[in-house]
Amino acid sequence: MAEEVIHPFSGLLILDLCSEIAGPYASKLFVDAGARVIKIEPRGGDPLRRWTASFQKLEEGASSPLYQYLNAGKESILLDPRDAQDRAHIAELAARADLVFEDWGAGGLEERGLDPNAWLKANPRLGIVRLSPWGQEGPWSRFPANDFTLQAATGSVDYRGLPERYPVAAGGRIGDWVGGTFAAISGIAAWRSACQTGDGQIADVSIFEAMIQCFTIFGDMGSQFTGGLLDRSIEIPSIEPTKDGHIGFCTITGQQWTDFCSMIGRQDIAENERYMDARNRMADFEFISGAIQEATREKTTAEWVELCEMLRIPVTPIGNGGTLPAMDHMIEREAFQLAPGGFHQPRAPWRLESCQPREIGTTSALDEDRAEVLDLLDDEPVQPEVDFGDGDLPFAGLRVVDLTAFWAGPYTTSILSDLGAEVIKVESIQRPDGMRFATPIRNEILWEWSHVFHGVNPGKRDVTLRLDDEDGLGLLKRLIGEADIVIENFSARVMPAFGLDAETVRGLNSRAIFVRMPAFGLSGPWKDRAGFAMTVEQVSGLAWVTGYEDLPLVVRGVCDPLGSAHAVFALSLALEERERTGLGQVVEVALVEPALAVAAEQVIEASAHGVVLGRDGNRMPHAAPQGLFETREADERVAISVTTDAEWKSLCALLGADDWRLSESLSTHAGRYAAHDALCARVSAWARPQSRDEILEQLRSAGVPASAAINNHALWPNEQLKARRFFQTLDHPVTGKTRYPSFPTAFSHFERELHSSPPPTLGQHNREILQGELEVPEDEYDRLEEAGVIGTRPSFI
């Protein structure tokens, strides 16, 4: 008899009351890690069972490939909350569960006769994750919304695109995947806290707030530092034509920009300081873009990749559902797996040394597992013993040595800090975190004015150590010796070059968990390539479904925080493994793999149905009509999106469109999608004479998703965010009182304001850490400072 495989979350019981994408993705992550997940479905089942983006006709009773990807390995039971006995069954199952995920909207459980507080009374350690567009409370909490209208409300749509053309939203319903990812780590937080305290709680996740963290590049912080509105733009360079296709470039740093200009033979542009500022490149778009494309068309994609690799300029081929599985890097890393349904899907987006993700399970038909699920009710609920920890926050008592830079890594440790961990950020005065310099502000201490650095580094202490110096490296090793977690996000070659490979870290501290987040992983032909979020968006397919029909555009940064949240999830698995074995291990979360996981629909559609999904501005397969509509005020657009039959009927009634309401061809989503442009033209004619506020009031009252498409720098003031206390004001040593976005979940047992301190200045805690904790003598401290091993100002300024 085969030995039972133990996974990190073996033994966890989770109820999934969710449908579509967000909630099912959250619970899918737990399935991959070994949890038992029971999917509770309404009559008719999850609508995603019958959905394909290419409008395929599925066999009777068959579940769509995307549904299978999200729900394989879960047990299905049909329980209708309108039925008293079914409501009782749901409550009895909740009494035996560790976590419940639900997405029925603000007050949705209560409206269906279900009482989450009664569930907590019956099962005091239960974590209830409530996922909704705006959150459970606040003046907007019951406004209809979806991914498209939420994107518009964050301010992320208005600034994406060419100034002479219309703004475009990100494709692929990426906001739903973002919401699901943050729901998963909110579930982790509630569950770990319950294990430490014995107290369960409700985690109220706002998809809107999660999308603010992921889509806006901290635009509200930018508005505080620079003022004014943000112009619509695209990245230069980004996705450019080659002799045989397209290629994706990314020049985040000044060095990458000048090297790129030299590579294309435009030393004149490289030497023009005006173009070090990306805003000036956009202002001279025709000249700069023309110069770039004149050069890029002269070589093949492969030739440009080879040149960029030599110069360490982030580069990638452009991926889509058809090309991704055939890329050499994806093949070598086995990034895609064959599902039982016969299509290809991304593997779980994490790798641990101690275990593999659970094998892909089969997909249950609706109510297929009813008998097995109800058998659970024959046994009395068992409450596990409490392992009292260092506090109620889930990562309290853990020390993190943070070697990361830019966004994905620092935001990972920011989440850990918010949720209780002690984080020591390590920089050097020779090479501070490069994100410190991503700012248009030019003053004597500009490195303390980067809005993204501020956004991803609250709650940390900062020490500077020169790692190519024996003394600096020695001090870092002492910190590692006392750490629970060490984390870095450079390409695979960087840490070993400093003498900090996995074996060295293990030798310093056998219990340390070494989290590594290179763009493309620790193996494969691309492992030494540098890469940022835009690079990952270009290759993963996210850019392929975003933009104009003739021009794919990057989503702008979303892959960084997505990678961060997945890294927190993966780290939680390693912590469970350490409880079992007493040992740390390497945790690998290649930034590209969470992106592949949330862009999965493209590879799934291509492999299952032979259809390569594309892009067409704001027209997307899941909604019709959908678009940004002009109002009578200039630049005050309204985002409107119809995804359900009920919303369609409400729109027809509001517009007095009896012909639409009675049309047989428009009675289905497929029919409406076929008539999309004509529908949008009529909605546009209705909206254009009215004010934005008038339109929003009518649509929201009618139950049609709609939001103002605000400027990226106009998020605040916002009555919903104020009511939810989403922003936390902290007094920074340089920028003064500054408004910071917080974690997008309101926990019933945690403080809402989770940032323990403002972001640190460079080397702010050198004395506190080196002298106070490592007991470096005063004369030695002075010598290190004199030698440039430590310091508080960049050595090159």
Task: Give the ranges of each region predicted by the language model.
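Acyl-CoA thioester-binding alpha/beta core of soluble enzymes
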Residues: 1-45, 55-58, 91, 96, ...
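A structured beta-alpha segment of the ubiquitous adenosine-cofactor-binding alpha/beta core
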Residues: 3-4, 15-18, 59-121, 297, ...
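Mobile, glycine-enriched helix-loop/loop "lid" segments at the mouths of ligand-binding/catalytic clefts
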Residues: 46-61, 150-157, 432-448, 536-542, ...
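Conserved beta-strand scaffold positions in the cores of enzyme catalytic domains, especially
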Residues: 37, 76-78, 128, 202-204, ...
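N-terminal Rossmann-like NAD(P) cofactor-binding subdomain of oxidoreductases
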Residues: 83, 99-158, 469, 488-544
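The feature captures the short pre-catalytic strand/loop hairpin that immediately precedes
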Residues: 154-170, 540-554, 749-750
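Conserved anion/nucleotide-ligand pocket segment
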Residues: 166-220, 552-606
